[in-house]
Design a protein with these regions (language model features):
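Short amphipathic alpha-helical "interface-anchor" segments enriched in bulky aromatics
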Residues: 93, 280-290, 342-377
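A short, flexible helix-boundary coil/loop motif
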Residues: 277-313, 365, 390-466
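An internal, acidic/charged active-site-proximal segment
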Residues: 203-320
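Short, conserved catalytic/metal-binding motifs centered on acidic residues
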Residues: 74, 89-90, 124-131, 160-171, ...
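Charged, often Cys/His-bearing segments associated with DNA-binding zinc-finger transcription factors
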Residues: 1-42
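Active-site-proximal, Lys/Arg-enriched surface segment
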Residues: 121-195
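Short, positively charged, Gly/Tyr-enriched micro-motifs
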Residues: 63-143, 197, 250, 445
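Basic, short loop/linker segments at the boundary and entry of helix-turn-helix/winged-helix-like folds
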Residues: 28-73
Length: 466
């Protein structure tokens, strides 16, 4: 027997229309109206103009009967509900009609014989896939630029933090049915350091074999074009983004870059030579958390006016890190494009880059952003795109009030049903308290008497009973 296909239909909130239907003995379904942190989060998105940005997502549909915001919202909430795939979105979608009310519409699963009328617009997980499948890396970059500009308007204090970090992470999709090949990709993420984590603000997708440097250069160019040169006051990058000419350009734009040196670089050799001079002073700092037993004794020393990196014409200050182990000593070098900078400042800036490493670990371990189902390229990009966006937006929401911290953790727990019931009638829904619903039924019992079994069935569905 062919498995029945699940479909979703869009509903508009209309309290008067639903109550009028109830007075006629008509009710198409009941769902629990869960309230939790997600309710406040929905209001946060609305109040800060994020939903308006979702409405502007670039699309290529010939028919546009379903609002764009519904496609974007579905994937934004997917990681918050810890749903592993689009099929799971179809199975669960939103448990809080309040959230959807904030967005201006609602949705409920259509069961066989559960709805009597036609004319509503079908929406299912396949529709989500078809919407995002044509999108490419530039589509998501353009959309996130719009989000970035909105965040800049709404949260100017975030950008005054001044310390940004950038790194890349790989993800993949397994081979699927009907000849769908596996996919291997990477995303270069540029974010701002905020409360012991990094909030992703702009990112660019690419095939896994793409080099990090052109991806990173393009991201910085887009931020400068959107927000102005110098908005990135301090940038922390990985060695994969080492390029003297680029660092010089950023210096002229007002951006100080901090980066680790490769072992074969002349500037590192110069710092090692200068460190042998008798007047060199070393400062002890806490040992690194590098899971080595015993942990090393770590010391740092600093240098200014470093000139042996010919490709970099920006002024350079350096920090040499020395780790003493029982049987050997290890060195590593870090430089910052600045006219002045002591070892402690450079070292502390360097250690902030590990916040970016923690971010990538959290997105993998707790948010499972890279645990993707077999899907087309555009869909894979969309799943990761909205997971990154959900992490940033939820952190900003949490920062506005006394909410449970989610930094470097998983999403908060799923909401549980509370006092209100989402009541559906025709193409409309509203939220009613149980007493309000029962009062209407008892008042108009003459029309409800013939629908006793239907209302009991609806209540059982509400309870989750078979």
């Amino acid at each position: 027997m062919k498995e029945r296909q699940r479909q979703w239909f869009i509903f508009v909130e209309n309290r008067q229309a639903v109550i009028e239907a109830l007075t006629r003995g008509e009710c198409d379904g009941l769902l629990p109206a869960a309230r939790s942190f997600l309710d406040g989060f929905a209001g946060f998105l609305l109040n800060h103009g994020i939903m308006a940005v979702f409405e502007a997502f670039p699309e290529q549909r010939a028919r546009q009967s379903i609002p764009v915001v519904f496609f974007c919202g579905s994937l934004l909430y997917r990681p918050l509900f810890q749903l592993p795939s689009l099929q799971a979105v179809g199975d669960v979608l939103f448990r809080s009609p309040y959230i959807l009310r904030q967005m201006g519409f609602n949705a409920v699963q259509i069961g066989q014989g559960f709805y009597r009328t036609n004319g509503r617009k079908p929406f299912d997980e396949e529709a989500v896939a078809e919407f995002f499948a044509p999108a490419d890396a530039d589509t998501f970059l353009a959309h996130q630029e719009q989000v970035l500009h909105q965040l800049y308007q709404e949260f100017p204090w975030l950008f005054r933090q001044g310390v940004w970090a950038m790194d890349s992470v790989s993800f993949s999709t397994p081979k699927g049915n009907h000849g769908l090949p596996e996919g291997r990709y990477k995303v270069c993420i540029l974010g701002v350091c905020y409360q012991d984590t990094v909030l992703p603000l702009l990112w660019l997708f690419a095939p896994e074999e793409a080099h990090d440097l052109p991806l990173g250069q393009r991201l910085v160019e887009r931020v400068e074009a959107a927000l102005g040169q110098g908005v990135i006051k301090n940038l922390l990058v990985d060695r994969a983004l080492l390029d003297g000419a680029w660092l010089t350009l950023l210096w002229h734009h007002g951006t100080h870059v901090t980066v680790s040196l490769r072992e074969n670089m002349d500037v590192l050799s110069d710092m090692l030579g200068l460190a042998r001079l008798g007047e060199t002073e070393w400062m002890e700092v806490p040992p690194p958390d590098n899971h080595r037993d015993p942990a090393p004794q770590r010391e740092i020393t600093g240098f200014t006016d470093l000139t042996s990196w010919e490709a970099c014409q920006a002024p350079l200050c350096g920090c040499l890190i020395r780790d003493h182990y029982p049987d050997h000593t290890e060195y590593q070098g870090v430089v910052m494009t600045a006219e002045a900078g002591d070892a402690k400042t450079i070292y502390e800036r360097h250690t902030q880059r590990w916040d970016h490493e923690e971010l990538l670990m959290s997105l993998t371990r707790y948010w499972h952003f890279d645990r993707l189902p077999p899907c087309r390229v555009g869909v894979a990009y969309a799943l990761v795109h909205f997971a990154l966006l959900a992490f940033t937006l939820l952190n900003l929401y949490q920062g506005e009030g006394d909410h449970t911290a989610i930094r470097n953790q998983g999403p908060p727990p799923l909401p549980l049903p509370e006092r209100e019931i989402a009541v559906y009638a025709g193409p409309y829904f509203t939220l009613l308290r149980p007493s309000e619903l029962m009062e209407i039924i008892f008042t108009y019992w003459d029309v409800w008497a013939d629908h006793r079994d239907a209302i009991l069935d609806a209540l059982k569905r509400f309870e989750g009973s078979p």
